Amino acid sequence: MSKTLYQKIYDSHIVYEDKNSEAILYIDLHLLHEVTSPQAFNALRNKKRKVRQSKKTFATMDHNVSTKIRSIHASGSMAQKQMEQLINNCTEFNIPLYDINNPNQGIVHVIAPEKGMTLPGMTIVCGDSHTSTHGAFGTLAFGIGTSEVEHVLATQTLKQKRFKNMKVEIIGEMPKFVTAKDIILFIIGKLGSSSGAGHVIEFCGNVIKNMSMEERMTICNMAVEMGAKSGLIAPDEITYKYLKDKIYSPFGIFWEKSLDYWKFLKSDKNAYFDKCVTVDISNLAPQITWGTNPDQVISIDEKIPDYNNINSIVKRKSAKSACEYMGLQSNTYLTNISIDKVFIGSCTNARIEDLRSASKILKNKKVAKHVTAIVVPGSGLVKNQAEEEGLDKIFIDAGFEWRLPGCSMCLGMNKDRLNFGERCASHSNRNFEGRQGRGGRTH
């Protein structure tokens, strides 16, 4: 029987399956951070349980950390408490931790791939919705809730139903100045923020084949913004080259054996997909969101749509509400709208390739005097590499603040946030109301 990539990975991780209930899947890697793990550890203690596979568990601090100084005391009392709890929990249960003083510390979805922890064919979970990022490696990766975090810590398994299969084929030639972020935003805008609900999406096509791993991670990172459980891309030579000689990658004879298995990880020719979509990006222009949902997006040269012309009552109300919150009017160009802040960072776009691209545009240019702009590398490794290449100097000369690694302004859980009514051009993945701070407006 022909199978999709998702079905192959799912089936190979079944510990137990009953026709009357969901399957129990083995989890190869469990990623932790300071925000969604404290309650799970407390539950373990209350039930007198231990962590079943501490060596298949990895933790870092990212959501709450200060990007100005290396101190757990710099982001408020709640953040400090969560980071202290993570340190204590990892010490007690013998879990590897990149804490605030570790030179490798950074965003969990940046660290795991760059260290070779993320490998094709694995199952990976984390108490964070953008765990789908790891799907770029042909990995079944998805976010889980705190009660599920507890379950994985205790059993290294997770009860999980079978999701439907969706294929998004991306074809054409990538236009100049168009990035992976533009492509996935365009797809979300075209198909809708619930188009992937109940599905795992496999991205394929010549555009995907020509993408770097950094670009593929951006695509899979935002699969959840289509409502999908996760995103997947079949591994290939680009994947293998990226993983070769990483710290946690297989080596020697184990590398060769892994390659043999990884080459099997692709959808069979006649595999059935419940939904198939083909998207041609040959004429695509850079994309930017105007509203409070990722599917409220337009090309940079388009006007904000007139919500009065939207047929769907629900979408019309949503568009009107978004315009009111964002302080925008229909039929205007976003290029004429003034911004207050710029954020380059997040698990979507804070890797070395992203910083290189941004620095090329900024070289010999200056940030407007009224704009506050920050760059937050995704990890210590990315930061060090950028500094070796002199990218930090380009950003600083342009008027940007060069910060320490962390989630930063992607979400309002630390001191990097928007003030009420401020408008930000952001590299992050969500433009929800208040996402970057109460009353903040995100593009």
Curated annotation (Swiss-Prot):
Pfam families: Aconitase. One of its GO terms (molecular function) is 3-isopropylmalate dehydratase activity. One of its GO terms (biological process) is L-leucine biosynthetic process. Its EC number is 4.2.1.33. Pathway: Amino-acid biosynthesis; L-leucine biosynthesis; L-leucine from 3-methyl-2-oxobutanoate: step 2/4. It is an enzyme of class 4 (lyase). InterPro entries: 3-IsopropMal_deHydase_lsu, Acnase/IPM_dHydase_lsu_aba_1/3, Acoase/IPM_deHydtase_lsu_aba, Aconitase_4Fe-4S_BS, Aconitase_4Fe-4S_dom, IPM_dehydratase_rel_enz, IPMI_cat. [4Fe-4S] cluster binds at C347, C407, C410. Its cofactor is [4Fe-4S] cluster. It catalyses: (2R,3S)-3-isopropylmalate = (2S)-2-isopropylmalate. It comes from the Bacteria. Coiled coil: none annotated. Keywords: 4Fe-4S, Amino-acid biosynthesis, Branched-chain amino acid biosynthesis, Iron, Iron-sulfur, Leucine biosynthesis, Lyase, Metal-binding, Plasmid. Gene3D superfamilies: Aconitase, domain 3 (3.30.499.10). Binds 1 [4Fe-4S] cluster per subunit. Catalyzes the isomerization between 2-isopropylmalate and 3-isopropylmalate, via the formation of 2-isopropylmaleate. NCBIfam families: leuC, PRK05478.1, PRK12466.1. Belongs to the aconitase/IPM isomerase family. LeuC type 1 subfamily. Heterodimer of LeuC and LeuD. This is 3-isopropylmalate dehydratase large subunit. It comes from Buchnera aphidicola subsp. Uroleucon aeneum. The lineage of its organism: Bacteria, Pseudomonadati, Pseudomonadota, Gammaproteobacteria, Enterobacterales.
